[in-house]
């Protein structure tokens, strides 16, 4: 299975990079992982809604360039569906069983995802109603993907 994580912005903090590297290493046993970072646009202070939408559109266009036609796209969105870790593992397994061997997870920037990206998504997923820094969220997503594969393989880890 091929899994891409397409996210806005670069990871700067060493502790987050270390966690991403660790989960990437762990996931190499289960899938081919590709982490893609697209540039984030600077948001001016007191930006209008129109300015924010333009920024999301620019970031969205960069994201869409990295999504393959055959990808099952899962957008991480506050308005998405909240599911358990078991349901998440079922979602990944159902992709595989229905011939979707390529999953693209999309993490937006500080303003979220553009309408174009959300409309391309096959599934909208929310981890919580709370807001998280998108850099930290990448680690959380990798951990849940790793947990999902451990669940699917019946291996100890999930508790």
Swiss-Prot record:
The keyword Secreted does not apply. Specifically methylates the pseudouridine at position 1915 (m3Psi1915) in 23S rRNA. It is found in: Cytoplasm. Pfam families: SPOUT_MTase (PF02590). InterPro entries: Alpha/beta_knot_MTases, RlmH-like, tRNA_m1G_MTases_N. Keywords: Cytoplasm, Methyltransferase, rRNA processing, S-adenosyl-L-methionine, Transferase. One of its GO terms (cellular component) is cytoplasm. It comes from the Bacteria. It catalyses: pseudouridine(1915) in 23S rRNA + S-adenosyl-L-methionine = N(3)-methylpseudouridine(1915) in 23S rRNA + S-adenosyl-L-homocysteine + H(+). Belongs to the RNA methyltransferase RlmH family. This is Ribosomal RNA large subunit methyltransferase H. One of its GO terms (molecular function) is rRNA (pseudouridine-N3-)-methyltransferase activity. SUPFAM superfamilies: alpha/beta knot (SSF75217). S-adenosyl-L-methionine binds at residues 76, 108, 127-132. Its EC number is 2.1.1.177. The gene is rlmH. It comes from Clostridium botulinum (strain Kyoto / Type A2). Homodimer.
């Amino acid at each position: 299975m091929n899994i891409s994580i397409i996210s806005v912005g670069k990871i700067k903090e060493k502790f987050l990079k270390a966690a991403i590297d660790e989960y990437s290493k762990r996931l190499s046993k289960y899938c081919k992982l590709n982490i893609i970072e697209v540039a984030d646009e600077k948001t001016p202070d007191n930006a209008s809604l129109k300015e924010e939408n333009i920024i999301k559109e620019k970031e969205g266009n960069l994201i869409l360039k990295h999504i393959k036609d055959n990808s099952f796209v899962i957008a991480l969105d506050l308005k998405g569906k909240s599911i358990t870790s078991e349901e998440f593992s079922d979602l990944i397994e159902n992709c595989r069983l229905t011939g979707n061997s390529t999953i693209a997870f999309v993490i937006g920037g500080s303003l979220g995802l553009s309408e174009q990206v959300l409309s391309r998504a096959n599934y909208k997923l929310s981890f919580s109603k709370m807001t998280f820094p998108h850099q930290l969220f990448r680690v959380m997503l990798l951990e849940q993907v790793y947990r999902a594969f451990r669940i699917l393989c019946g291996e100890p880890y999930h508790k």
